[in-house]
Regions:
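Short acidic/glycine- and proline-prone juxtamembrane loop motifs at membrane-interface regions
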Residues: 137-145
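Perimembrane helix-loop-helix junctions
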Residues: 8, 190-235, 239-243, 365, ...
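Short periplasmic/luminal acceptor-recognition loop of GT-C membrane glycosyltransferases, typified by
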Residues: 422-423, 431-485, 491-514, 540-543
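Membrane-interface alpha helices of multi-pass inner-membrane proteins
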Residues: 169-187, 191-198, 233, 339-347
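Transmembrane-helix signature of polytopic, membrane-embedded enzymes
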Residues: 104-129, 330-333
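Hydrophobic, aromatic-rich transmembrane alpha-helices
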Residues: 105, 287-334, 338-342
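Hydrophobic/aromatic-rich transmembrane helices and adjacent perimembrane loops
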Residues: 341-388, 394-400
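Membrane-interface transmembrane helices that cradle and orient dolichyl/undecaprenyl
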Residues: 113-118, 150-172, 180, 204-211, ...
Length: 558
């Protein structure tokens, strides 16, 4: 009986310790994230997520009531934040940071036993220190992708070690695949790369066991069928939901057809050729390394720009060290697979702007992993000085040098963090939560001239005004030339039937060199005929439907 009581006490202590560690991780991550809260103002892609979330939270249907070429996960996350009370950029970010802190804490606790505390906890810490680059602090799909790609790499390393996938592994892989692809379509490329890496490991195992072709196929199926089922399940559920809502066809058209067939015409063909999408990141990575090394010499100076260059080069160095270490310690073929996955994570960039954050996250995991391995190595070298070989001394020297570089980098970020916190405390900046109460702000009049659930016609790619006014858009298929090309007939038909009373419209609106009057002449003519500016001098972009103009002017002039 005493033995059982002791076991129970030990179990309870273990659970308490786990909970305390998890809470500490959450607090540390959240405090670090708060340091970048006001690092950049509202951003187009971020505001788009807000608006989509507001539409969903108000009962609207994605891709039917809110036209978008993006995948749905970020909109649904923002919808939850809106329902929790988020009413400004400040509040949306604050709530989202809580979500990020929970996700990073979960990853740290889940993989702490397999990878060690330094690697599991350190990955999130290192990643967050990279969010001081402009726009990387925003609520973007890249934030979700970053966590998911780290999970996929961790699961691959575990599979390469164990050669098996249990249900726990499958659920983690399924969640990472669904959230990353559901947040951004381009996640398909790194997902494909890591899937190939998993397959390579299993094929190597079949070759090692000298299986025949048919036996190898059976073995591969036996290994991966659970993962296939768990990965397909959430996508099947999503398809079922959209089919039930009657939005499945428009979802496929918006998220796939527009991105593959129409949008590439406006971005130099990017994404139109599938084969090149798997090759270009490799080429771009090589060019990024060459450019970084060149600028490291030619652009020397004590500036933020040069610090960014140094940071980029350190990331490339971490990649190479990890690849070489893994190839030497584990398997060179698997190392090559990891190389390709790393490059595919940088499909949108490698140079510390917000599109490159998934690549940065994977690199930060590699840095934390190497530090964890070096720490274990130091423990094995805890012997008398004369027993340490020259090779071991050299390895220790390299490890110490790496620790110094990492320490300096962390100190630099700590200085930035303190400065950011000071800015928040001094300015009390809350990012437009009070704009709808300021009569000199257009958001006030959009809010005043519309009812609570009334929609506003938005014709630009900057939805910030609607976020400030706490109003949702009347579709958004006019704000970009590729979206108008995709939805012109539907947009004009809807306007003829049910035109909003208030519109945000700029006749001179130009996006990437495309004038609205040129890519949407029918719409421009319709606006000229049916809408009039409320106050052309003070708010030239605020238009009122002609039959509501008299009432609006009376309210405005009170």
């Amino acid at each position: 009986m005493k033995m059982k009581n002791k076991e129970y006490e030990n179990t309870q202590k273990g659970i308490a310790k786990q909970m305390l560690t998890c809470i500490l991780c959450f607090v540390v991550y959240l405090i670090m994230l708060l340091g970048v809260l006001n690092r950049s103002p509202g951003f187009t892609d971020e505001s788009d997520n807000f608006i989509g979330g507001m539409v969903v939270a108000s009962g609207g249907r994605m891709y039917r009531d809110f036209v978008s070429q993006h995948m749905p996960v970020m909109y649904h996350i923002c919808a939850v934040l809106k329902m929790l009370g988020a009413d400004s950029v400040y509040e949306f970010r604050l709530y989202f940071y809580v979500v990020l802190a929970v996700m990073w804490s979960f990853v740290a606790m889940h993989y702490k036993k397999q990878f060690g505390q330094i690697t599991a906890v350190g990955t999130g810490v290192f990643y967050i220190t990279n969010l001081f680059t402009f726009y990387t602090c925003c609520i973007l799909a890249e934030q979700v992708q970053s966590i998911c790609f780290v999970v996929l790499l961790m699961e691959f390393l575990l599979f390469a070690e164990r050669k098996k996938l249990d249900w726990n592994n499958c659920f983690m892989i399924s969640g990472a695949v669904f959230l990353s692809f559901g947040a951004a379509f381009v996640s398909a490329f790194p997902i494909f790369a890591i899937a190939v890496a998993f397959l390579v490991v299993e094929i190597q195992e079949c070759i090692r066991k000298k299986y025949g072709f048919l036996q190898s196929i059976r073995e591969i199926w036996q290994t991966f069928w659970r993962a296939i089922v768990t990965i397909l399940a959430p996508f099947a559920l999503l398809i079922f939901v959209y089919a039930a809502e009657g939005t499945l066809s428009v979802f496929i058209y918006s998220a796939y057809t527009v991105n593959r067939e129409i949008y590439p015409n406006y971005i130099a063909g990017y994404g139109s050729r599938i084969v090149m999408s798997f090759v270009e990141p490799v080429i771009n990575y090589g060019m990024a390394i060459a450019d970084g090394c060149r600028k490291l010499v030619t652009d020397f100076g004590i500036t933020k720009e040069y610090l960014a260059i140094v940071r980029n080069v350190i990331c490339y160095a971490v990649n190479v060290i990890f690849w070489v270490y893994y190839a030497k310690k584990k398997n060179i073929v698997q190392a090559v697979a990891i190389v390709y996955f790393t490059m595919m994570c940088g499909t949108r960039g490698f140079t510390h702007e917000f599109h490159s954050m998934p690549y940065v996250a994977v690199t930060m995991f590699m840095a934390a992993y190497l530090i964890g391995q070096f720490t274990e190595y130091f423990k094995t070298c805890n012997v008398r000085e004369e027993q340490i070989s020259e090779v071991q001394k050299k390895k220790q020297g390299i490890c110490y040098a790496g620790a110094v570089v990492i320490g300096i980098t962390i100190c630099i970020y700590c200085v930035q963090y303190v400065g950011a916190c000071r800015s928040i405390l001094l300015t009390g900046q809350n990012f437009c939560s009070a704009q709808k109460n300021d009569v000199n702000n257009i958001a006030y009049w959009v809010h005043t001239l519309t009812d609570v659930d009334e929609k506003v016609l938005l014709t630009t790619i900057e939805p910030q005004i609607l976020v400030e006014a706490d109003r949702i858009p009347y579709r958004t298929g006019i704000s970009a030339p590729w979206m108008y090309e995709a939805f012109a007939e539907e947009e004009m038909s809807n306007l003829e039937e049910n035109a909003p009373r208030v519109a945000i419209y700029t006749p001179e609106y130009n996006l990437w060199g495309y004038d609205l009057t040129e890519y949407a002449p029918d719409f421009a003519a319709y606006m000229s005929e049916n809408y009039t500016p409320l106050d052309e001098e003070k708010f030239p972009e605020l238009y009122i439907r002609n039959d509501y103009l008299g009432v609006a002017k009376a309210i405005y002039n009170e």
